[in-house]
Amino acid sequence: ILYDKDDKQFAKLGSEKREKVTYDQLPEVLVDAIIATEDSRFFQHNGFDAPRFFKAVLGQIAGNPDAGGASTLSMQVVKTSFTDAKVDSGMAGIIRKFEDIYLAVFKLEKVYTKEQIIEFYVNNHFLGGNIYGVEEASRAYFGKSVTELNLSEAAILAGMFKSPNAYKPTTNPQNAANRRTTVLYLMRKHGYITKEEEAIANAIPVESLTATSANLNVNPYQGYIDTVVNEVKDKYGVNPYTTPLLVYTNLDIN
């Protein structure tokens, strides 16, 4: 339960919306978009991509904002599905990163196929509000099943994995469009689509793709709620949608 600055309840977070899909149900354009954006060598490495890891680390040390992330898709699955969501920094963060590498290489990839790992990734990932997984996200943001997504919609959805609330198409269409441009560029770069397909998908207005707000049942303070949820996850490693909590905020509803 979330309370405002006057200790009045303004939101009650129920169980997250989640409907799982199998790898075979995922459209090829969505799988391609996720792989191109999140882990282009996913099907080649064993859970740890050394060149990418050290390139990202050196880039971050040098202060390069475009250095990219060091985590493979498998490492992200370990973090979101098999360990707590708390974000560590400093030495604790370094230790946590190597724990993720160990679990990804010697546990996850030894037991599950690449296709199963993708299933974990798309079904368990937070995608804004109280939505988890691509099926619920597709229905909420585009009004259709994930199996029906076109290239433009798939690129938008794949782009949300980096920062769901920042790139939510229903509330931040311009951010979503900018992120879609990046995803489509990466898809072309890695040979998944042609330049013509990239241009056509980029030309579609995001607003014309999204479901109407009437279908979304949006809390008027949803943006603030999303921020609070992320802060609680980062600081305490718990999910307010699944863990009973009383959260007191500074929200002034007036």
What are these regions (language model features)?
Residues P27, K110, G159-F161, N165-N254:
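Extended, non-catalytic substrate-recognition/exosite surfaces adjacent to catalytic cores, especially
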Residues Y3-T194:
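Peptidoglycan glycan-strand catalytic modules in the bacterial/periplasmic cell-wall system
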Residues L2-Y3, Y248:
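Short, conserved beta-strand segments within well-ordered enzyme catalytic domains
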